[in-house]
From Swiss-Prot:
It comes from Candida glabrata (strain ATCC 2001 / BCRC 20586 / JCM 3761 / NBRC 0622 / NRRL Y-65 / CBS 138). The keyword Ubl conjugation does not apply. Keywords: Mitochondrion, Ribonucleoprotein, Ribosomal protein. The gene is VAR1. Essential for mitochondrial protein synthesis and required for the maturation of small ribosomal subunits. This is Small ribosomal subunit protein uS3m.
Amino acid sequence: MKLMKLLKLNINNNNNNKLLLKNLLLLMNKNRLMNKLSNNNKYLSELNNKGNSLQHLNNMNNWKLQNYNYNKNNTINNYINSKLINKLLYKLMSLKNNKIIISKPLYKINMNVINIRFYYYNMNNYNYNNNIYYINMINKLMNRLNINMNNLSNILSYYYNKKVIIEPIKLKYLYNNNEIMTKYISLLDNNKYNNGLLMEYQRTLNNIMPKLNDHNISMNYINNINNINKLKYNNILLNNNNNINNIYNNININNNMNLLMFKYLIGWSIMLKGRLNKNISRISTTYLNNGTFNNKKYLWGNLNNNFKLNYINSNNNIYNYNNINKNGKYNIKVKLNYI
C-alpha cells in the first residue's frame, strides 16, 4: 500500500512539474510578445518581414527518403536498397517505351508499410495516334507494379518483410516536376540547334510551359501573406489579457493557407553551359529566364527587392543534369519558382 501511494505521489509530482514548466514557458513567451507589442509598428513590421521569408508558412520540404529510424544499420541498408530499386524502376518504366521520363522515387518507410512514389511523364502526350498504345502499355506497367500476383510490390514485400506500395503518378505538364523537365531538355537534339540555340529552345519551351500570369498571382500571394500577418497580430492583441493558452488557439488562417501550397508556377530559369555548338570551340553559357527570374526591372524590380521571390528556399526547385553530346560535355540547370 505504501509503495502504491508513493508511486501515485511521484506521478502527481511529475505531472505538476510538467504543467509548471509549460506555464513558465508560456509566461516567458507572453512577456516577450508584450515587450514587442509596446511598439505596434515595430512588431507589425517584424511580422511582415517574417512573412516575406515565408518559411513558417510554406514548409514544403524536398525529401527523397523518410525513414523510421530505430537502427542505424537498418537506415544505411534502406538507403542502399533505395538506390537499387531506383535503377530497377528506371529500367522497368523504359522497357516498353523509352519516351517515358520518371523522377527519382520518394521513399516513406514506416513500421509496417513502405510507400514508394514517383512521377512520370510521357513525351508522346501530344501524339494522338499513340494514345491507345500508350494506355495499354501503362496498364501493363501498373499490373507489374501493384496488381498481379507476381508484381514488383509483392516481391519487394518479401525482401523488406513488410508491405510495399508503389504509387506512380502521371504528370500532365513537364513543369510540374523540375527533374523531369531537366531530363526532357537534355533529350532535345542539341546538334539540331547549332545555329540559333536560344531561339529554338525558347520556341520549344513556349509550347510546353504555361502562359504565365505571374505578376498578378505574385501580388495576390503577397497580399494573402500580409492578411495572415494582420490576423496573427490582431489575435495577439485580443488575447493578451485572456488566458495565455488561448493566444495560439484562436487564430484561423485555413482559408488563406489553401492558396499557398505550390499551386502556381511564377518563374523559371534555365542555364545551359558547355560545348553546345560545333562552330564554337570554347565553352559557352546560355540563360533562359521568364517570370520572376526575368531581368526586366520595370516588371519585377520592386517585388524582388522587397519580397525576395527568387530566394525562398521552400518555393524554389533546383535540379542539375550533366550529359555528353557529340560536341563535348554540357550542364543543364533548371530552377522553377512555385507559390
